[in-house]
Each structure stands twice: as structure tokens, then as C-alpha cells.
């Protein structure tokens, strides 16, 4: 059983990496203003060497291009919710996202 530690900022990410957690979620939603910016994942990963830590990019992922971009900057997995729940064809949306990998 693993624990997923969620971070939002560079400071939080640095502290979590020092503590050697193996599973880290980078939330792309700014909790102060609720704005979503998927480049938050890239910013944090550029600042620190993730080593063997598995990175899950969370929030703001709406399609295959987002997944391809996040994968290219170092994310290992993705948490997708809203875009799947808002689509009329959930099966097609999940398939589209899956094949982006």
C-alpha cells in the first residue's frame, strides 16, 4: 500500500522529495484562486530532480495533447476527472486519453 502525497508549490515539492516519498501528485490547481495551469507540473519538475519518485499530474487535463505534454515534461501518471465526467461519451474519452500514452 502506498500513500499519495499531493503538492501545489515548489516549496511543498522540495520538502516531499527530501522525505523520500515514492508517489507524489502535483496539483495544477492554484488553491488560492482555483485557476488551473498544467504548466505547474513542468515548473516543479524543472526545479527538482524527481529521482525514482513517481509523479502524478492532477487537474486541468482535458485531452490527449495535455497527456502527451505532461508525459514529455516528466509526469508518470495522470489524474483526470472533470473532462471525463463532462463528456457525453465517457468510453470514447477514456480511450482517447489512454491511447495518448
Question: Where are these predicted regions, by residue range?
Answer:
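Small/polar loops that bind or transfer phosphate-bearing groups
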Residues: 4-5, 58-59, 82, 86
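Catalytic cores of alpha/beta
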Residues: 9-20, 52, 57-80, 92-97
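Glycine-rich phosphate-binding active-site loops on the catalytic face of alpha/beta enzymes
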Residues: 25-34, 73-94
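A short, acidic, amphipathic alpha-helical segment used as a generic capping/interface helix at domain edges
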Residues: 41, 45, 63-64
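C-terminal helical cap(s) of enzyme catalytic domains, especially alpha/beta-barrels
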Residues: 43-47, 71, 86-101
